[in-house]
Regions:
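Domain-level detector for secreted/extracellular nuclease and nuclease-toxin modules, and
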Residues: 1-323
């Protein structure tokens, strides 16, 4: 059970800290229990994102205010996209950006720490997200048909309590995934999830899991075209991702005992991994699948770790991640 009273921001980040965030966390506009609103990006003057050609400089963060939700991305507003944050009491679970066009998530951002893990058993109770309009969601009582129901934030990563786990079964956290060679039994995505799980440390790991729906050329040169599927549960057309990615930010040592804001850029590391949505049993994370965060930003148009100006987003060294 989560020891809420004794957790720091870096151990089990608190939802209440949203209200103490700097203006750069402003994309989250709704509170828990209210209807989600379309994503709106606000560019704060103190932490504007540099152009891709401008290098980030190493700087200490001792004078920076606490960063409430370091994992949050920012992106251009679009009326078809909705974001909402789910929490359990004072402890936040995850934030999702959901596309009402694809009827599937664009990204899910979450803090990762062993304190979120326990022995709660999954119930597979796939249900509508109570904070979004039902008419923009798709029903998932069973699999899509051709594709399995793939978690963006895994059920196994949130089993410290019943409520934490149940929230991972909201349909806004689910996207179509190939079963064989991808989602299960040593598939490419299954192996990447295992790799990311090994990066969880004493300090908090900040993670964004995302999906791409435009045509994508995988690292082996295979072009994966844009596609859709008909969800057999409600006959709704659902976008099928052409690629999935994970973006990570954490301290290098993993055991500083300090918040991200208190660390220098030299004490941090971040990287992105992307895999084409195709059957590739045995495929494991490699340097070929690795990008710098800045490179993924150029590919997706999303500003990752937007509230962490000293994150080393232009760096991506495979050796830093044991590759």
């Amino acid at each position: 059970m989560l020891a809420i009273s004794y957790m720091r921001d870096e151990i089990a980040p608190r939802l209440q800290e949203i209200f103490h965030a700097e203006q750069s966390a402003a994309p989250i506009t709704q509170k828990e229990g209210t209807e989600a609103t379309p994503l709106v990006k606000e560019k704060p003057a103190p932490q504007q994102v540099e152009s891709p050609s401008t290098p980030r400089t190493a700087k200490t963060a001792t004078s920076i205010k606490p960063i409430a939700m370091p994992e949050l991305p920012q992106m251009q507003s679009a009326k078809e996209n909705y974001i909402t944050t789910h929490s359990c009491g004072e402890v936040r679970n995850y934030t999702v950006c959901y596309s009402s066009i694809h009827h599937s998530p664009l990204w899910v951002a979450a803090p990762m720490h062993r304190s979120y893990e326990g022995d709660t058993k999954r119930k597979d109770n796939y249900t509508f997200d109570p904070t979004l309009p039902v008419n923009v969601q798709t029903r998932l009582n069973s699999s899509y048909g051709e594709y399995t129901r793939g978690h963006m934030l895994g059920s196994a990563e949130r089993n410290a309590s019943r409520e934490l786990n149940d929230q991972t079964f909201y349909v806004t956290n689910i996207a179509p995934q190939l079963r064989e060679g991808f989602n299960q039994m040593g598939g490419a995505w299954n192996n990447l999830e295992s790799f990311v799980d090994k990066q969880v440390c004493a300090d908090t790991l900040y993670l964004v899991t995302g999906a791409i729906y435009e045509p994508y050329t995988d690292s082996n040169g295979e072009l994966i075209p844009a596609r859709t599927t008909i969800n057999k549960n409600d006959e709704q057309e659902v976008g099928v991702p052409t690629a999935y990615y994970k973006v990570m930010l954490r301290t290098r040592s993993g055991k500083t005992g300090r918040s991200i804001a208190e660390c220098t850029s030299e004490e941090l590391k971040c990287a992105a991994f992307i895999v084409g949505h195709r059957s590739a049993k045995g495929r494991k994370p490699s340097a070929e699948d690795m990008l710098s965060v800045r490179e993924l930003e150029l590919l997706t148009g999303i500003d990752f770790f937007a509230t962490v100006p000293h994150a080393p987003e232009t760096e991506a060294d495979p050796k830093d991640w044991g590759l």
